[in-house]
Amino acid sequence: MADLLGIVAIVFFYVLILVVGIWAGRKSKSSKELESEAGAATEEVMLAGRNIGTLVGIFTMTATWVGGAYINGTAEALYNGGLLGCQAPVGYAISLVMGGLLFAKKMREEGYITMLDPFQHKYGQRIGGLMYVPALLGETFWTAAILSALGATLSVILGIDMNASVTLSACIAVFYTFTGGYYAVAYTDVVQLFCIFVGLWVCVPAAMVHDGAKDISRNAGDWIGEIGGFKETSLWIDCMLLLVFGGIPWQVYFQRVLSSKTAHGAQTLSFVAGVGCILMAIPPALIGAIARNTDWRMTDYSPWNNGTKVESIPPDKRNMVVPLVFQYLTPRWVAFIGLGAVSAAVMSSADSSVLSAASMFAHNIWKLTIRPHASEKEVIIVMRIAIICVGIMATIMALTIQSIYGLWYLCADLVYVILFPQLLCVVYMPRSNTYGSLAGYAVGLVLRLIGGEPLVSLPAFFHYPMYTDGVQYFPFRTTAMLSSMATIYIVSIQSEKLFKSGRLSPEWDVMGCVVNIPIDHVPLPSDVSFAVSSETLNMKAPNGTPAPVHPNQQPSDENTLLHPYSDQSYYSTNSN
């Protein structure tokens, strides 16, 4: 039977978040204020007009990473493998720091709108669309995974239907994201992070004083855990590198970086948010340690609802460590506060992922690939439709797919294996080209898929060294990533040499990126595509070659120079 008091508490929390989201959305400038600035309306919705201060940026960056899966996963990992098995908090914290060092300043200085802009700027629109596939899958499955975690938590503590709780949470997050854009997402993240921090810390001491909970300091060796032998250490390192570098190429990260007022602020929020992720992992880690050192026979917990009690949580129930601690080791009112914390964590991540996927579709797919002449109003409408569609897809997946965590895990692998080397090369390797990018994409994808994924019942078509009992202990993910990066470099350099030396005829340059550059890739003052082609975002032809500048063209600032919407009024009157 549903707990009415708990439902009232959750409804109050949801109403609070909704009100804050609507209020924050009103901070956006009106359409009249934005008419004089080319591209300003799009930036206002997608990036809050690049007006997010460092403090708010730190809060929203931290809140996005500290989602429901982060909290539940940290507690579960510590319960199963101890502190050494709890890699996500440390991995994601280092990931934020590395992102700040490698990409935050460079990407913000270039004035990009999304993570995919440098790909379309250098390789062309179609490559940007190809990079969108793993990015979209990752964001959507991530949203579905955290919604599923919330539904399971609400069903355990409140006894309400999982479908109803997931649908309601998704609708609220989608609604304020739809109406308020990035402003709503950023400011609700501030409230949600506060709720997460307070809610979890209220629950920890309450759980510690339960009669069944033992003093965790007396059994430190038990909850610290161990990695294992050489094979296990190899797998541990592979997974840690996946978290560190695979956590960078996500639009949710770059949305915060690119919305910062300055490039220095973008770096600062990355560094400080990394520390914030570590601090926010302490409460769920303690919850996992408490659960690991609890004699569950001294509680009312019966995993099979038949009166049978167990000393420890069964393996198939350990993904519910956090809600079980709330339910059986804390007073009722404390459990409701903890539930609010988990709900806040889920919504702070879900809204960000939905907006990120929708922004990439509207800007990189619709505007730069499908409809290059689309107005800003049309792009914003498309983005809002995409917000609804992504929200619906994630909700359906959360309700229907049993192995949603497995799908998200596989997508996270693909982001690490495919997108990270691509992003590193497009930013730091001036001679990389479309041929290298395509070859690297294919190599990374194949090497990862042949390794299999048990979580989604994908068999291993190739047994890497140390393959034992269905487990790939060899660091094949990192091997695939490095192979992809090496392929990008080698194919790019060799293709350039072959074409420029004359060994290959220019007609064979079918991608038009070395010597056979199509006429529509060269900016012409009489062509509207001059204002919107991704190859002219920085007034350069593909692969960084300086492009001719029209004598009547006015100088542009840092952002408008790179902006596909800049000076459309000029081209609309001079393109006939």
Swiss-Prot record:
One of its GO terms (molecular function) is choline:sodium symporter activity. Residues 566-576 have a biased composition (Polar residues). PROSITE patterns: NA_SOLUT_SYMP_3. Belongs to the sodium:solute symporter (SSF) (TC 2.A.21) family. Disulfide bonds: none annotated. Imports choline from the extracellular space to the neuron with high affinity. Choline uptake is the rate-limiting step in acetylcholine synthesis. Sodium ion and chloride ion dependent. It is a multi-pass membrane protein. Residues 27-51, 104-126, 187-192, 255-270, 341-378, 430-437, 500-576 are cytoplasmic. It is found in: Membrane. Residues 541-576 are annotated as: Disordered. It comes from Caenorhabditis elegans. Detected in the nervous system, including the nerve ring and cholinergic motor neurons of the ventral nerve cord. Keywords: Glycoprotein, Ion transport, Membrane, Neurotransmitter biosynthesis, Sodium, Sodium transport, Symport, Transmembrane, Transmembrane helix, Transport. It holds the Pfam family SSF. Residues 73-82, 148-165, 214-233, 292-319, 400-408, 459-478 are extracellular. GO terms for biological process: acetylcholine biosynthetic process; choline transport. PANTHER family: HIGH-AFFINITY CHOLINE TRANSPORTER 1 (PTHR45897:SF4). This is High-affinity choline transporter 1. Glycans are attached at residue 306. GO terms for cellular component: axon; neuron projection; neuronal cell body; plasma membrane; synapse; synaptic vesicle.
